Regions:
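Short, leucine-enriched amphipathic alpha-helices that occur as contiguous helical runs
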Residues: 24, 28-36
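Histidine- and aromatic-rich ligand-binding microenvironments
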Residues: 75-96
Length: 237
């Protein structure tokens, strides 16, 4: 074989390897998505790998190939949910921390940073097609073990940073100390006005007379959440 022939002979092999890897990743993601739903519906003990494999359109040995065990698959599900949250929230948390780094930041800038956190929470919980599956999975995990490694992982990667930024933004806006005994509860209540829409979404839509949480509906929720938050924060000064 000539030197000129070699690249042509290697290219198909590289293409096949790349295509095989892409298919493998697609299969892995499909299994994780199905497993999150099944674990959420039945819990870790009640879910069977055979059921998950069938629903994902793969044979049972495929689960062992990709995840080693049922425990490995369960952990991969938790990591997937955590990674999605980190990916979604990290940019806005970083922006909030940048505002906090400016000791001369205006009250408007501080509130806008907090409002962006509220907006991101709305988008994350109401735009996701798989929100209900993820929420059920997390609820099962919380019921399964009180000191959940999954919740500790989420808190380590995202929760602590988000919580700290939120507390400091509200504290500086209101002119109170971040260690104020009531501040943590107040911030939780500000976020709670948004989180209420994530539980029983179908029932909530029916009560509101909406067909879905579309762009118009989300814009209204964000606007009102900001208005109510600012009114409350002004009253705490």
């Amino acid at each position: 074989m000539s030197h000129d022939d070699q690249p042509a002979s290697r290219a198909p092999a590289r293409h096949r390897a790349g295509a095989s890897y892409a298919r493998g990743e697609e299969t892995r993601k499909r299994i994780v998505a199905v497993a999150i739903r099944v674990f959420g519906e039945r819990g870790f003990e009640g879910a069977s790998t055979r059921e998950i494999a069938k629903a994902a359109g793969v044979n049972a040995p495929a689960l062992q190939y990709y995840f080693d065990s049922k425990e490995g698959l369960y952990q991969a599900c938790g990591e997937h949910i955590a990674e999605l949250a980190v990916e979604h929230f990290s940019p806005v948390v970083d922006e909030a921390r940048a505002v906090l780094a400016d000791e001369h930041a205006s009250r408007d800038a501080l509130f806008e940073a907090f409002g962006a956190l509220l907006d991101t929470l709305v988008d994350h919980h109401l735009l996701s097609e798989h929100l209900d599956d993820h929420r059920l999975f997390m609820a099962q995990e919380q019921a399964r073990q009180e000191n959940s490694p999954l919740f500790e992982m989420v808190d380590r990667k995202l929760g602590a940073r988000t919580r700290d930024a939120s507390l400091q933004l509200v504290a500086r806006y209101c002119g109170i100390k971040p260690v104020d005994s009531e501040l943590r509860l107040r911030v939780m209540m500000l976020y709670g006005q948004v989180m209420g829409f994530t539980h029983g979404r179908r029932t909530m839509l029916t009560k509101l007379g909406w067909e879905k949480f579309g762009p118009r509906e989300l814009a209204m929720i964000k606007r009102l959440a900001r208005e109510q938050s600012r009114t409350l924060m002004d009253s705490w000064r």
